[in-house]
Amino acid sequence: MKKLISALMVVVAFTTSTYAQTDAKAKAILAEVSKKYKSYNVVKTDFTFTLDNPKAKVKETQQGTLYVKANSNKYKVAMTNQELFSDGKSQWTYLKKDKEVQVSNVDNSGDAINPAKIFTVYEKGFKYVYTGEEKAGAKTYQMIDLTPVDAKKAIFKVRLSIDKAAKQIANVVLFDKNGNKYTYNVKTFSPNVNVPETTFAFDAKKYPGVEVVDLR
C-alpha cells in the first residue's frame, strides 16, 4: 500500500504554471481545463488509482476520495489504509495499520509533489500534443500526450483523457522507465462542495491511540 501512495505522489510530481509551447490545439484545450478548474473553490472527487507492471506481475488498485481547494495547497486524500492532509503549511500522512501519523512541513516550491495539483499536472515541464478524440458511451474524450522536457525524468509519457463537454480531466495515465503504469481514474467530480477548514488538517482528538511523529 505504501507503493500506491508513493505512486499517487508521482502523478503530481511535475506541476505549476507555464505551458510548453508545442501544440496549439493541446494548449487551447488545457487552458480551458485549467481556467474552469481554477474557478472552483473546493472540489471533491472519488477516484480509482492503479499501479500496474505486467512484467513484474504487479497490479494494485485503491479507491479513494480527494478534497482539494483548487487555488491552494489544501487537500485531504482518504483511502482504505491511508489518509493525507494538508492545510497549506503542514502535511500529515496517517498510516492506519501502523496507527501512526507523520507530520512534515509543506514544500510550497513550484516543483513540489502535491495532491492538490492533480488536475493541473500538465502545467509545467512537459511538451504536449493533441492525438485525437475517443468515444466511450455517450461521452467524447480529447486525448493529449505529454512528454517531459527533461529526458532524465523517470516518467517518459503522460496521457490525459479530457471530457470534451465538461472540460475536465477524466483520466491520467503515467508510464515510467521501469515498466510501471499509473492510472488515476476520476469516478465522480463535484465542484464547490461545502466543507469546514478543519477538513484539511489532522485532528489528533479524533484518532485516539495514534502516535504522532513530528518531522518538522
Residue ranges and their predicted role:
Residues 1-7:
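Positively charged n-region of N-terminal signal peptides that target proteins for export
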Residues 5, 16-59, 71-73, 206, ...:
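N-terminal leader/targeting segments and the immediate start of mature chains
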Residues 49-51, 79, 95-96, 173-176:
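Beta-turn initiation residues at beta-strand->coil junctions
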Residues 59-64, 180:
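Amphipathic hydrophobic-ligand
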Residues 65-113, 182:
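An acidic-aromatic
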Residues 106-139:
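Flexible, surface-exposed loop/linker segments and immediately adjacent secondary-structure boundaries
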Residues 131-133, 137-208, 213-216:
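Gly/Pro-enriched, hydrophobic low-complexity segments
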